[in-house]
Amino acid sequence: EIYQKMESDGEVLSARDRFYYGRELFYHREYVEAVDNLLKFLQLPEGFVENQAEACRVAARCCYELKQNGMALEFLYRGLTYRTPSGELCCDIGKHFSDRKKWEQAVFWYRNALQVSENAKTGGFVEKECYGYIPCIQLSVCWYYLGDIEKAFQYHCQAGTYKPYGREFLKNQQYFISVKQ
């Protein structure tokens, strides 16, 4: 509401304000307006690089909600143009492909998520699980559907090193125990 009022009062939003306004609209499920504001932010040259990459991720989530899957993927790829790939962005792209049962493409992106180093010094939003647990759990799923149960099990075990009490890990653990017997 603060940003809406600023705009209606004729104030020009700074790049930072435009970014946070777009995020706020997303969290209030105003997806079309969110994408519009995030695009305006991305057109501003003074935008912080980490915020530009994050804006692409948020815009992609809006597009998924709006059932514009192709545009969502375009935003995710655009996020790669602002900085070196992050675990978060690699996981988002991997999810795009795994949701469509394109397992080999998903494997590529989840493997990349494991290769990327988490860099908290950039000042961007860091989702620690995107650098270990999530890619491992998802690689386990991908390899299962690709028919390689051994690789699926290996990634399952690796996921457990990151989060031994994770809901997904424990659920998969029951499955692998039943298969191994």
Regions found by a protein language model. Name each.
Residues 1-40, 46, 179:
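Catalytic-site signature of metal-activated, phosphate-bearing donor transferases
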Residues 11-12, 46, 50, 84, ...:
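Short coil turns that delineate tetratricopeptide repeat
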Residues 16, 50-54, 88, 127-129, ...:
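Start-of-helix register in tetratricopeptide repeats
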Residues 31-32, 69, 103, 149:
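TPR-repeat structural position
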